Amino acid sequence: QNKYLRKILEMYFVENKEFVDAFKKHSAAKSVHHGFMGGLLEHTLSVTDMCQYFAEHYPMIHRDLLITAALFHDMGKIQEISDFPMNDYTDDGHIYIGARCMENAAAQIPNFPPKLKNELVHCILAHHGKMEFGSPKVPAIMEAMALHMADNADAKLQTLTEVFTQAGDNMGWLGYNRFMESNV
């Protein structure tokens, strides 16, 4: 509903066919979660659904900001992770790339509110939740915290889904999982 955020969404998802094509095909990771073609889109839609839930249940959350941040939170992975069949990490970090893209897009939109731009960029920068997990910022607003929680939940639940699917009928203890930092 917010006209400025709608314009950013249109710039990428309506007007930029190259971005849309890459976004649909890319993985969300090399091997940890959603490490398959289309994984980025699947992960993004799952995170966005969870963020929609948060926005409905916590009225103080700025819904349009949160949904926009959810749709763009991992956009930098298109540049950070090489295309298939390589699907390997490049030197660029997706958090910084995504934040920079949002800043550049906001700068192209006349009268884009500075506070709204800062909040959107903050959500992107803080979506890993902790500095030791790669976030240059920790969540300082409700939208950033909700995005972090949705991103973390989807990544971990998808990881467990993949682990248990590979285990097949062997549903006993499978051993230590590095990403979960626990025996599963």
State what each model feature region is.
Residues 1-91, 130:
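Acidic/His-rich, divalent-metal-binding segments that scaffold phosphate/diphosphate chemistry
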Residues 3-7, 17, 114-118, 144, ...:
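Generic alpha-helical secondary structure signal
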Residues 15, 28, 165-172:
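Alpha-helical protein-protein interaction elements
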Residues 53-167:
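Divalent metal-dependent catalytic cores for phosphoryl transfer on phosphate-bearing substrates
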Residues 148, 170-178:
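N-terminal intrinsically disordered, cationic/polar leader segments
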Residues 178-184:
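Terminal helices and disordered tails flanking the catalytic cores of nucleotide-processing hydrolases
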